[in-house]
């Protein structure tokens, strides 16, 4: 498969999921607006860093490389990244193609103080709400 084919397949999968997502966008927006900020934003953290900043990534597999580390503990790895000085942690949440999950994102969010990025394919406003 070529990279374009991987991307086409992944985007098609996410567009289909978005089409079948029946959650109320208004309700999701209300939920987001009621949440308290828990720490610095990604932008605030990066701008506050002196020199180079590292965004560490949690990824179990990739469509092009296959299994990378399927049995990794996302929380343990995020904490190790934070101790090592990572400015932010990027968590893949696509299970089908990358082995990630929303649970990984939530668990990592609870376990570290650095900003967390949800890394996924964003094809719908609900995806932004999920982030």
Region locations from a protein language model:
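Short, glycine/charged-enriched secondary-structure capping and boundary segments
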Residues: 25, 70-71, 103-106, 131
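Alpha-helix-loop-beta-strand connector modules within alpha/beta enzyme cores
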Residues: 39-50, 99-123
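Glycine-rich beta-to-alpha transition loops that act as phosphate-gripper elements at the mouths
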Residues: 57-61, 68-72, 95-99, 118-128
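An N-cap/entry alpha-helix motif that binds or orients negatively charged groups
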Residues: 2-69
